[in-house]
Amino acid sequence: MNGDTRAAVVTSPPPTTAPHKERYFDRVDENNPEYLRERNMAPDLRQDFNMMEQKKRVSMILQSPAFCEELESMIQEQFKKGKNPTGLLALQQIADFMTASVPNVYPAAPQGGMAALNMSLGMVTPVNDLRGSDSIAYDKGEKLLRCKLAAFYRLADLFGWSQLIYNHITTRVNSEQEHFLIVPFGLLYSEVTASSLVKVNLQGDIVDRGSTNLGVNQAGFTLHSAIYAARPDAKCIVHIHTPAGAAVSAMKCGLLPISPEALSLGEVAYHDYHGILVDEEEKILIQKNLGPKSKVLILRNHGLVSVGESVEEAFYYIHNLVVACEIQVRTLASAGGPDNLVLLDPGKYKAKSRSPGTPAGEGSGSPPKWQIGEQEFEALMRMLDNLGYRTGYPYRYPALRERSKKYSDVEVPASVTGHSFASDGDSGTCSPLRHSFQKQQREKTRWLNSGRGDDASEEGQNGSSPKSKTKWTKEDGHRTSTSAVPNLFVPLNTNPKEVQEMRNKIREQNLQDIKTAGPQSQVLCGVMMDRSLVQGELVTASKAIIEKEYQPHVIVSTTGPNPFNTLTDRELEEYRREVERKQKGSEENLDETREQKEKSPPDQSAVPNTPPSTPVKLEGGLPQEPTSRDGSDATTSKPTPPDLSPDEPSEALAFPTVAEEAHASPDTTQPLAEADPEPASASAPGAEEVASPATEEGSPMDPGSDGSPGKSPSKKKKKFRTPSFLKKSKKKSDS
């Protein structure tokens, strides 16, 4: 193309659709060597390169673990829908192809075997191949046993314990019907699957042939049948021929206790093996040599046998037996003989603990109690699953701890999320690394948007603001972040019926009110204690205490405590005489009051002569407290008879005021004075009355008192006045 042609193109009217070649050549540099190579390439070769580029994406999708998981979930859903649905065989073939085509990115096998070659080629036959009608033919327990035994065969091949098609590992399926699982004779250990195992009875007759057309080596099964018949506790038997085991079986010293693995086997049994067990006497002899408790049997010049109550226990004993034999063979080769070896004492040797402790700082709960060999076997099953064997083993305890999310309190996810694909044409399929990265981003975005469980709806533009506003509306049926946990305080692994019965029993006790304070003392059971009430003690009369018989001897007191309870007869007699003397003095004081009323001016009203009592001293020198009108007495610090003088108008232990005396009746002291006919001379003749420090200012008639109508504001209120009997004694002393 020259310059004239380009000018003609410019001047000509533009076409409606520009040609594709012209846009392409405008973008391509003709002098680029890469462009020249592609232009000179043959069309078929160019098409092949384009197909390879397209297949790269397909292969990447097929090799992604996410696609495998989704495919397996689809297969499981198809199994649930029917036995032979349309397209199930195609999905199964795709799943097998995906399992076999996974690249070898996992760690290598422990030692080797045929399985190592298969893994290097990316061709691993899955252990759990029970699908379709095969899985329906067996119950759940037999499925698990088939998967365990087939995985055991794979482990034996990986550890190098296999010897072509020989050796056998068997397990008991049903103790009632005496059915056993064994490998078909002619199948390598690396080819054994769950469906290929053969079910036989105790005589070696085939009950279920499995998925193969191979038979059973009945001569090899006779050893297993003899042990199963003698040991009902045996659930799994392993018989292998390893070089180290055959070497130890040929030694006269047998297995020496020179390693912890040798001591972990317990009592080791030996049997002189003379070939295949064809007669009954040989079976009886091997049963006698094994005994009822031995877990390990060494066949002289032949091989090793282990017996276990489970598949895991049988693997544990055979593994330790093989390791102990290898240690002994290598030790004898370097030491020169058994005499140069140091033997361990089984009684003093402390075996390692099999129950791991709870990790520090974790409160999620203790791990399960492992049986013998379960923890080791489960770890090896995880290894096989990581290698792509698909063992189908039911794990008891997860190896990886699920990290608790930081924002687990936000239960309700966001109504809207900001995550989107890179482009509209992106289908969502990506590489595993990108898928993991996007999953983390989605988790973070989900939490950021999950602050509210409401629905966000945007309102359109209005006249006030050109921007859209977000309006939150409450979602119906929204769950709260905290929900009640059922049976929160019920212990785990308990019978719920027992918990309900205990709850009903507690409720019945509460309704019938039959709960007690607990067991009574047997020492003080029959002792009756008489309690005497002391002065000032608070006596309770609670109805609940009386009815519940917590306090059998209850004294119900309707009045106050007796103030004369602690006084002697002599003190009571002196108190009686003192009261009589005071009453006599009150009568004389009343006469003096009448005389003063006559001499007083007529405009002043009469005020009752009830002066407060002041402390006096008896002949014993004891102070006398003021008395109350009603005869009650307040206790003193010393055992002095209480003063029940009728002069005081208050019941409390306090001096009355003038205002209180003003409201008192002038005749209040008269009945008390007339009640005592005895003369005032009945008091003790030797009693001396000492005048109190009160002055003469406290006269009986105080015009400044509150009760007087002629009260003078210049006069101060007198709170304390001299008693009448003290005034009388003072007059006598003056005269």
Curated annotation (Swiss-Prot):
GO terms for MF: actin filament binding; calmodulin binding; protein dimerization activity; protein heterodimerization activity; protein homodimerization activity; RNA polymerase II-specific DNA-binding transcription factor binding; spectrin binding; structural constituent of cytoskeleton
Free-text note on domains in this protein's UniProt record: Each subunit is comprised of three regions: a NH2-terminal protease-resistant globular head region, a short connecting subdomain, and a protease-sensitive tail region.
Modified residues (Phosphoserine): 12, 59, 64, 334, 353, 355, 364, 366, 408, 427, 431, 436, 464-465, 481, 586, 600, 605, 613, 705, 708, 712, 714, 724
Region (Interaction with calmodulin): 715-732
Matching NCBIfam families: PRK07044.1
SUPFAM superfamilies linked: AraD/HMP-PK domain-like (SSF53639)
Localisation: Cytoplasm, Cytoskeleton; Cell membrane
Role: Membrane-cytoskeleton-associated protein that promotes the assembly of the spectrin-actin network. Binds to calmodulin.
BP terms from Gene Ontology: actin filament bundle assembly; barbed-end actin filament capping; cell morphogenesis; cell volume homeostasis; cellular response to calcium ion; cellular response to retinoic acid; cytoskeleton organization; erythrocyte differentiation
Oligomer status and interactors: Heterodimer of an alpha and a beta subunit or an alpha and a gamma subunit.
Gene3D superfamilies, per the entry: Class II aldolase/adducin N-terminal domain
Residues carrying N-acetylmethionine: 1
Annotated signal peptide: none
Principal subcellular localisation of the protein: cytoplasm
Record field: compositional bias (Low complexity): 1-11, 678-712
Organism whose genome encodes this protein: Rattus norvegicus (Rat)
Matches recorded under InterPro entries: Aldolase-II_Adducin_sf (IPR051017), Aldolase_II/adducin_N (IPR001303), Aldolase_II/adducin_N_sf (IPR036409)
Any one of the GO CC terms: nucleus
Modified-residue entries (Phosphothreonine), positions: 331, 358, 429, 445, 480, 610, 614
Residue ranges with Basic residues bias: 713-735
Biased composition (Basic and acidic residues): 576-601
Protein name: Alpha-adducin
Pfam family name, one: Aldolase_II
Family in the record: Belongs to the aldolase class II family. Adducin subfamily.
Segments for region (Disordered): 1-21, 418-486, 576-735
